[in-house]
């Protein structure tokens, strides 16, 4: 304090000396001299005040943008997302703004803007003192108020938002002072803008930042929103409508107030006549024309591939944070792998098939409620449970915390709701919340993805049947893959030296496994989807094609469940896997995207390439700031991959193959090899199909939003009936399009000398009709495998020992077999 006191005393003396000197200026002077001194003093004080505001003297006025920030000023811009074929498929934005250059705008707009908003624009340097004096005079004389802000001042206000984004300091807390500080800062910024930018640049920046209402920021978005044209295509009358809105975007909005907008448009046109930018004859003609709009407000959810775009946003979130970008304001150009034409084919295929699936589902259940448990009993409180997870229920609970009757009343009170309909899209009905939930949960859902195995590029992505109604993306939803998981069982078998022509017996067997939930050993036995075992030794190629569960589980034990899980992870499965014997039948949840990536590893000769959604990103200045790397890794031997390619093709060629119906869609394209694998989880809750060719891998899933909602029979609910046709319709369109001729190719001959045709070219297996014989079946069960809690075999029992725990005769499905008929081979 002792050091500060002398400084304060010195400052006090200097201030007193200044005021003494200033008073002496007036003494003995003429009145006009005193007047001049007063005026000069005010001018000096004004500029000293502006300087103090600019430098935030003693933190009294708050921070202001510096010269560098003004010179390199940037605005919030929408990021654009492009397809691989160069089509703009959507935007990410908070304010829908896409900048344009001065030359990209019709000159009529510039003329209308200057003539109306700032007629002395080319004469002032940011502040129009003539206009300011006129505005003061009008205010004093109570005339109609005129705007005193120049275009440059408006730009300063729009771009830097002094009223919201910057503090007004300690003095800003005083009543009436805050607005003075804000206006002062806008004047200072306007002057700096004139010093750092040309008039043309200022006009362009203004046109790109100004708000035209309807979430249209900037001239490009406004022209698209109101007239569905580019700024270059604007006519004089259209330009006048947009300029007229700048005075008050709501009051003069052509949608909200068409009469006001028309009157304001004609005022703008008359201003153009007054300044010689429009002839009287042109005005007389144009002013009689009604405003013709092609109005369409653009949202984040316009365009195509909505689920894909959400996935891209999720993927880029971390990249944006790490690289100091904002996806919704940084004006990035994002180039993706999706092909707009293939996406269109995929969406059409999904809707075409799902309409039929929904018809089958509705006919199948009739008036019954489909949310049933495994014993076919309606699940009590199912709809109520869904309702309690809805925002409306949480709102009602907060409003009526101790009044459940009121909550129930409002949940069951009819009101207008928006629902999905296949024929009409979004429909509006008078319905209660509970009834709308009942209506919507009856829908079956789907997902689809197409991927290039060599690049990992995702070419088509369908997350569900309608984004507006169901925003949850089923491509990344976790569901049981069923028999599609057998790919990894057989791949590991190939890794360990087996071949497609090696045989395993289709027979009943059981095993003791440790059930962690019950904390004890239980007996588990796999069953085939057709309900019986042939007892035949079947080539692995046929067992895979027919999706025989007993062989898959036996192989799982031979190869080791842990090894199979490791192989699955190497090939592209990222989700955790429960290493139990049932894993061989697809008991652990995974998603369609990672499954397609793993199947791509087989198509790519054993080389794993992580799926790619974004190829490159360019910033607002045209600089490339991201390029997707191509990381390829050989994760399974080429020999295993080649043999699995043959196995997959067996699914479409072997007698009884579950994927044979794919030939009905792609059979005419004989220059292309296709393999496939179907899958159906327990109770037909999840139906899958994966299709593989050398250059393209496709996958589809079909099921209910909740696992308890499903078909009751494999004849309707299996993967070959529900999911496969989506891929089939898609492939018909793609392979028939000359633009995608590159996808029409064959796998070719083996590249390794140690691969012989005898390994995969074996005689087709034809399932013979088998007599029902307990003795014969018992012969096939020669041993029982007992596993510890980690799934490892610990002991083996003979057939005689087995009877102590329960003979095959006691197993309900051990001997049952139907007569020859169409059956589902891909159920768990």
Predicted segments with their positions:
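Conserved catalytic neighborhood of penicillin-recognizing serine enzymes
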Residues: 141-167, 229-232, 296-307, 498-564, ...
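Short active-site loop at a secondary-structure junction
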Residues: 98-103, 437-446, 469-488, 501-504, ...
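Non-catalytic structural connector segments
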Residues: 144, 279-337, 341-402
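Short, well-structured active-site flanking segments
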Residues: 122-132, 217-219, 279-284, 494-518, ...
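A penicillin-recognizing enzyme superfamily signal
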Residues: 336, 340-356, 387-452, 457, ...
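Peptidoglycan glycan-strand catalytic modules in the bacterial/periplasmic cell-wall system
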Residues: 75-285, 301, 307, 466, ...
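Active-site SXXK
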Residues: 112-114, 272, 346, 455-456, ...
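N-terminal type II signal-anchor transmembrane helix
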Residues: 2-82, 120, 357
